[in-house]
Amino acid sequence: MFDLEYQLKNLPDKPGVYLMKNNLGEIIYVGKAKILKNRVRQYFQKSQKHSEKVKAMVKNIEEFEYIITDSEIEALILECNLIKKYRPKYNILLKDDKHYPFIKVTLAEDFPRVISTRKVTKDGSKYFGPYVDGSSVKDIIELIKKTFPIRTCKKNIVEGAKAIRPCLNYQIGLCKAPCAQYIKKSEYREIIDDVIKLLSGKHLDIVENFKLNMEKAAGNLEFEKAAMLRDKINIIEKIGEKQKIILNNFDNEDYISLYSDGKDTCFQVFFLRNGKIVGREHFIIEDTFDTNSSTLISNFLKEFYGGTAYIPKTIYVPNIEDEVLLEQWLTLKKESKSTIKIPIKGEKKNILDLVEKNAKTTLENFKLKYLQEKALYDNVLKDLKNILRLQEEPIRIEAFDISNIQGFDSVGSMVVFEKGRAKPSDYRRFKINTVKGADDYKSMKEILTRRFQHGLSEIKSIQDRKLEFSSGKFSVFPDLILMDGGKGQINIALEVLNTFNINIPVCGMVKDNKHRTRGLIYNGEEIIINKYGSVMKFITRVQDEVHRFAISYHRSLRGKNSFHSLLDDIPNIGEKRKKDLLFNFKSIDNIKKATYEELLSISSMDKKSAESILEFFK
């Protein structure tokens, strides 16, 4: 048994990391300390300085562990790693550990490419970003490919190497074919220099040059060439408009601020690269209560930069805790100097104020939307209770569906809605184990049996250990079950529930002959719900979601198991090469007819794999 008083007395006088646990043994908080003895004891001392969140956490602490480190910076690194590993309830956690996309120009290559990446390394390449919107990176790269004749293949092309036959991109004017040695390295680099200028925001120079060439072409009556240059000018201007210059310096900087309303906090991040805003992002952290802003920002920085691929040269914040220590940690991660600054006045302070205003607006809009949705969902659940004559509003709803094609790879899905909102963390997928062929009823019986068997086992385990009730994977039962089907599916569900002596109302979601949600079946009767507009929309959403979830799982299994072709029998041809070959050649017959050079034009192919194909079809 854990003796709290004894453990507190024997805490070491050293730096380290502490892990707080609840009565289930779950890690609910991870922290670091310069002196473990002082920091951990503070939690258990009565103090008005404790925030509401800390007080709530302390009530749930059953025991703690600690790990001694050689220094405070080592403790900080370990803390970040453990938070990422355990995702403790009372730490600041960002919902998505984002690695933002960058545009990478591979300058270490003789003939560089322009690609998207989420990993920044010291490899001689030039990186532009991060971009918050991944689709904008894709759009920009596609626009660059249309404007500048640069290669898109992954071949290792070196100036002076043996020439190979160029691909289709050369034929249609999208590439200068360095693979065929049709362009010198120096000439190709001039094109890449223009790409870098464009990505650096210096697009006006390129536009001016293109305009001169366009006018010259028009003067020579080369109207087709002039029109092509005009289109390229429009594309370049479109890329240039995506980024607005707001500073005259050219540093890479992040501006981070926050706004708290007493309960929740919104963090806002502005990414400035080369004096331009390239993106912004916000994160809403609930239940921060009266935690001071310097602590919040310190914790946010650890979580945010612990999971990002890129750390800027300078980070501006309104205030912060552990500034020197965090700078050391950021510099270690970046492998070059990174500085945290608190601007007092001037344009940097003005930008930070703007970031805070955006955080305030974002939080207010989030709350407004939340309240509007809550009112809507409250009414939906109230109407659903009345329509079905339930004793209570169905706070937790679980829906089930089966998916298969001609009896292969049958799968089941369970989606969960709580208080009217989808709860993806509780979604579950089931691969059918006991049923052969296409039998939806037996398949449904299997997944429902597994779902409630697991739930009862979890509940028994919690009761046997005399623990507080805690939601496991299946231990929280629904207030209402929705089946994607009619009376047959309902009867299967009721049969399973009766087996376990569980009493939960079960409805069937039925569709019309156009496959649209028509109504509900409950207690053997069909209930028309189209006069309840919001209920109809909600049931349609649930039905679509459970179907989508089942289909997505089925497709993933089908993709792994059901496709076999002649290519699977060829040595040195794996999944990646098989997909690339079929994508480019469209059929096995075309692959059979392909020449050695045509096979090598596929980015994932090498000499050995091309020779294997030629040998196989010989």
UniProtKB/Swiss-Prot annotation:
MF-aspect GO terms: DNA binding; excinuclease ABC activity
Compartment(s) where it occurs, according to its Swiss-Prot or TrEMBL record: Cytoplasm
Keywords: Cytoplasm, DNA damage, DNA excision, DNA repair, Excision nuclease, SOS response
Presence of keyword Disulfide bond: no
BP-aspect Gene Ontology terms: nucleotide-excision repair; SOS response
Sequence ranges assigned to domain GIY-YIG in this UniProt record: 13-92
Predominant location: cytoplasm
Ranges of residues in domain UVR: 204-239
Keyword Cytoplasm assigned: yes
Pfam families tied to this protein: GIY-YIG, HHH_2, UvrC_RNaseH, UvrC_RNaseH_dom
Cellular-component GO terms for this entry: cytoplasm; excinuclease repair complex
Alphabetized InterPro entries for the sequence: DisA/LigA_HHH, GIY-YIG_endonuc, GIY-YIG_endonuc_sf, GIY-YIG_UvrC_Cho, RuvA_2-like, UVR_dom, UVR_dom_sf, UvrABC_protein_C
Family designation: Belongs to the UvrC family.
Assembly and oligomerization: Interacts with UvrB in an incision complex.
Descriptive protein name: UvrABC system protein C
Gene symbol of the encoding locus: uvrC
